């Protein structure tokens, strides 16, 4: 007997009680099975730039593979991770590199940073990657 999972993704962003602007960037594509949120680090330069780079790099890197039909839920023997999780790991590392390079090239962005949390749904598996204190919740039941 096989169960069919229903995927519902929601996001909420709020600048909080201290900040005057929001440094969050969110990307969600339920059909492709991906959700990415990055929260620029408040108090640092260009947090919104860092969060934008992170979400763009991860989503743009993941989407072609998610839409390719490649079986990303298979387990990689060497790492024990799914192919989707390995791809997500690579894209988060690429985002980090992109943020670092942008900070080096633009003095106004020196020291910028962001948290990131991403979920990729492949078959009956979900892979979650995160750096920092942004959260992803799994809710079940009614």
Describe each model-derived feature in a short phrase.
Residues 1-142:
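PP2C/PPM-type serine/threonine phosphatase catalytic domain
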């Amino acid at each position: 007997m096989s169960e069919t999972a229903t995927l519902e993704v929601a996001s909420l962003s709020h600048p909080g009680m201290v900040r005057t602007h929001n440094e969050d960037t969110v990307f969600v594509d339920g059909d492709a099975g991906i959700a990415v949120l990055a929260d620029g680090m408040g108090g640092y330069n260009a947090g919104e730039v860092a969060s934008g780079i992170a979400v763009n790099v991860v989503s743009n890197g993941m989407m072609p593979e998610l839409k390719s039909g490649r079986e990303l839920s298979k387990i990689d023997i060497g790492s024990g991770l799914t192919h989707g999780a390995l791809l997500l790991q690579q894209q988060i590392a690429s985002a980090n590199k992109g943020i670092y390079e942008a900070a080096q090239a633009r003095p106004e962005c020196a020291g910028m940073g962001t948290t990131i949390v991403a979920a990729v749904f492949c078959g009956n598996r979900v892979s979650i990657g995160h750096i920092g204190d942004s959260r992803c919740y799994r809710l079940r039941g009614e």
